[in-house]
Structure formats: structure tokens, C-alpha cells
């Protein structure tokens, strides 16, 4: 019963409690434990499974991106839960509509304080997202067509010889036609990619409309790419909690090859999720969760 009802999660900062070979009998024999060797420097190592519900969580992203309470957290909240973003990023047509709306708003409604290449910065962010996910295979072609086709004449945008000031409907139709040529591979979009896309689109939307200033949310946004690359190396999204249903009593999470900043974040995410899971699903108090954080002063 002890083996069935007790769960031990050991956060191992320095690689003292698990070694990557079949003779790993540290603490208990290998058959009684699950081992995760996480790494922020290599992309072919283990990834710790966390459920989708944890990814769609404001606290998760606030911790990861170091969001400030007053301005950055509300921006993150709208990025995660705004209905149009959540629903439209599920489909190819929805994503194209979001991209078109963002571009048309930048080009036709953006304030004069916007960078003149703000639309290109937006496409560059989609290009970066594609580099790590392959969700937009021809984004470079679309970006180059818009970059070469758009010109300004005394503050008036011209797209492939169509002046917005003279023929606004034709201008927008041409813009939509170019956006429609974007190829979207939804099979490459996991929960991390979807949320990063929501944050990108929301950032350019709220800056263009003047709801937020770059000074307030820019620092958070600038952390997005590096944190996204790190988090996708160490966590895998699963719809079924493989750790909870796993009957092995000991889980060792080896953080020896994880950078200092992520060493602080990973234990917070793991501990928060499993503590809340057991609190909610263990009302009869028959199961026991034991979280052991070795070298805990590293994150306290």
C-alpha cells in the first residue's frame, strides 16, 4: 500500500541522485523510480510532462516571464484569455484573420508615434515563431512581398501601387490577398506555440491602439523568445497526467544541465501543480505527496 499511495518528487539541482545509465540504484533501484534529465542547452533530453491546464495559467506565464503586477500581468491575462485570440488561433482562417486585422490596424489606424516599420517588426516576430515551430512555412515570402510592395507617400501608405488614401477598399483587399497566401501548418502548433502566437498578436494590437506603452510591456515581451525556447526544452504538454498515474513511488528531476534562471522556475511550476492536484483530488487523504527539494536555498 505504501508503494501505491505514496509519491515522492525529488528536485535534484546538482545531479547527485540520478545518473544516466542502467545501473542507477541511487536511493532505490531503477525499477522503482522515474528519472527526468532536463537540459536548457540541449534539445534532445527529457522533458517533464505537465498538463495543458497548467500551460493555460496566468501564474505559470507570470513566473516564467517575470511579469510585474500592475501592467504586465493584466497584459498577459488578456493575451491568454481574450476570447477572439483563444478561438481564432485554433483555425487556419482564424489565424489569417488575426494577422490581417493586426496589419490593417497598424497601417491604417496606428498612431504617428509608431515605428514606421512596425508592420515589418510584427512579421519578423511571426518569422521567429516559425523558426522554432515551422508553423508558417512561407512567412519569409509573405514578409518580403509586403516589405517590397509597401511604400509611403507623405504619410499615406501605397501597397503594390494602390494608394490607401485614394482607394482604401482596394488597398485592404490587396492586403487581405497577400495574407491569404500565407501557408499555416496547424500540425506544428502545440499549446506553447499557440500561446506565444496569442501574446505576439496581442502585443502588436495593444501597442498600435495605444492601450499600453512599449516602456511598460516591452521588457516582458522581449523576454518571450528566449523563455519560450527554454521552456519548450524542459516541459512537454500532455493531456493525461503521466506522473500521477505512474505507479512508481519516486520521481527524480535532474536539473544539473539547466541554467540558473530556469533552475528557479522549474521547481516552482512542478511543486505548484502537484500540490494543487493532490489538494483537489485527495479528499479522503489516502495518498501522500512528498516534495523534496535538495539544495532548496538555491530557489528560496
At which residue positions do the language-model features occur?
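A short, charged helix-loop
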Residues: 41-55
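P-loop NTPase motor domains
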Residues: 2-3, 8-10, 14-25, 52-300
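Short, flexible helix-coil linker/hinge segments at the edges of structured domains or between repeats
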Residues: 30-32, 40-43
